[in-house]
Amino acid sequence: MKICTNREEMLAVSADWAATGETICLVPTMGNLHNGHISLLDIAAQHGERVITSIYVNPKQFAPHEDFNSYPRTVQADLDKLAATGRCDAVFMPQTMYADGHATAITPGGAAEGLESVSRPHFFAGVATVVYQLFVQTAAQKAIFGEKDFQQLRVIQQMVRDLHMGIEIIPAPTVREADGLALSSRNSYLDAQQRAAAPALYQALQEAAEGLRARGENDGGDEAEVTRILATAEAAVLAAGFGSVDYMALCEADGLRPVTGANERHADKRRADERRADKKRAAGCEEMVLLAAARIGDIRLIDNVRV
């Protein structure tokens, strides 16, 4: 397993692989690896002969009040885990991703609007910029992104499509604990009481999704009823011990345009005609996703389920 600490080293390794016709798959991470990350390597190994895992805590996607300085950094443990898989051919862990005087950023629209961007307006510009850099600095042909960060996945897919980047984005299913909690590096922040309450977010999403599916089968969906279902899910999350819910949103799965319900208050940037069109086709739309973000103590958890 090669360890590359700068762009030149990484590109030299990738060039050697490409010269022999090997397909390179990238698994981008910020470290503090868990079984969810390892599952991405398993998928990457199915799609290419060579797998690169990047480890880089990207400062551009953290606001000043967020947890950049305290974000878990477990480099040696991460390297040990990657080596143990036997699936990682190179680790790209640059000291910095940006040249001195770097002043260019990618600012995505479309799928980046609403949801996470309401409380984290800086986030997707930071994500899109660093992911673009990773694609360039690894010369990968494919990249694996988890569906747990569903909006992020859609933003990256949109960027690749809009900029004709020529890299294939492969979605990977969310990996969960036995009680349903989606694996996340930030789960390590949870104390015992918070950890016991945390699965309520997924449980509420599941129950809401079941109600939405049943409603659609019965009468094609009713906006007031959908709003009630989402409000009930939000109340269940709060009752379980979460302090607040940033959003509980029903969206079209492809472009993440809001469909209807409690997420309407987060859709003010979307054109009114788009929202009306989405509502008209909501009943017949098989591809919808229910997304949520909620805070328990100082920890913010996100999750989603398909509807």
Model regions and ranges:
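Nucleotidyltransferase catalytic core that binds NTPs
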Residues: 2-242, 263, 298
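Phosphate/ribose-recognition catalytic cores of enzymes acting on nucleotide-derived substrates
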Residues: 232-269, 273, 278-307
